[in-house]
Amino acid sequence: MSIKIDLKIFLFVFLFLITSQIEMYILLMIFAIIHELGHVIAGLILKFKPEEIRITPVGLQVSFSIDSIEYNEKVNRAKVLNIKKAIIALAGPMTNLFISSIVILFGMFYKEIQYTYIYQVVIYANLLIALFNLIPIYPMDGGRVLKEVLHIIFGKKKAYKVTYIISKTVLILLTMLSSIAILYIHNIAILIIIAYLWYLEIVEIRRYNRRRNIEKLISSIENKEHSLIDSTTAK
């Protein structure tokens, strides 16, 4: 298992420092790491192996691998692999929602803590991380769940295409709403997050285009092979 650091994290730290929001950023990073641990635990339970851990400006990102024999078994069992991937994607946001629920429940029994700073920030931070990650923009958790569900319904090829269209549409709408919000809230953090989402979207568009080109190339080679076989058979 390899560990990599996204150097853009230092840019985020600098931007949050100059905007006097570094404490909030550190707190969000802590709960973002807990969020990712939810993915890891779910992956281990479902017999996936952590392959790479990447430290990014919005927390950790864990890539999983699966044994080739077990992978073939899962493929043969139809949509089991897609369901498991969707469960792993949901595990992170559910972890944050669970933490918020526990803290809220604790506050119901001990009402004096409801007005403390830490109580409100823990709830706010975890709800923010959960809702942010559930946005249907790939490769966010919501986008991953969407892709796996669409894969089950329509198949792999159409799932990628529809996920790409939905992701881009949602991101454009989110950018428009955020632009309006900045005028009233005057919080540069919103701008930073939107910019990072666009960066992720551009990276995924490039991967999507590369994937399509490879699929077209493979399809072209297969068609040529079939044509050669047919012509040889005819002779």
Predicted regions span which residues?
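Membrane-anchoring/interfacial helices and their immediately flanking loops
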Residues: S20, A91-L127
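C-terminal transmembrane module of polytopic alpha-helical membrane proteins
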Residues: E148, I152-K235
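Small-residue-rich helix-interface/hinge motifs
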Residues: I3, L17-N76, V121-A125, I135-M140, ...
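Divalent metal-coordination and catalytic microenvironments
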Residues: H35, I55, G92, N133, ...
